[in-house]
């Protein structure tokens, strides 16, 4: 279930799917995904698939975690990254091992509390959490070198663009229902460059915190 061989099979699949950043692969290899899902689903933790985590939310497919992390890091090391949608905390844990500091925003208090516990268990101390509306980001601590959004937005939130540092990278799924596209947005000297990277499937980015 959680054997090294099972994890290696996942890494092999990610490589076959085009993930090439060795740091990202190493971090996913050593991060215990089974700790981020319900015990009843632990036997499926190293399958390359999204799994339910309650509250109508999911833990992202490992390929998508790797892909989004790789896109974020493509221009070099990052000091300060904001994550919109803590969820189970799995993507958070991966980011915490790849960048200096992670600022993670989650609207569902129950999910955030459990994610905090998991990161403490893994001794990942470079993450700060905010319970709030992901559409608003975390303006008090802006700007960020990177922003990653783990739910699909109907449009790119202006607040997130405003909080992106010069040269910063925003990785976000945009669309609705069956039509969703992963986008990479880079803050350039004279505005933003936008790159559409292909079809994806995420749960929606909703407004407002809930207990």
Curated annotation (Swiss-Prot):
The active site is at 60. It is an enzyme of class 2 (transferase). One of its GO terms (molecular function) is protein-L-isoaspartate (D-aspartate) O-methyltransferase activity. PROSITE patterns: PCMT. Signal peptide: none annotated. Its main location: cytoplasm. It is found in: Cytoplasm. It comes from the Bacteria. It catalyses: [protein]-L-isoaspartate + S-adenosyl-L-methionine = [protein]-L-isoaspartate alpha-methyl ester + S-adenosyl-L-homocysteine. GO terms for cellular component: cytoplasm. CDD domains: AdoMet_MTases. The keyword Zinc does not apply. Belongs to the methyltransferase superfamily. L-isoaspartyl/D-aspartyl protein methyltransferase family. This is Protein-L-isoaspartate O-methyltransferase.
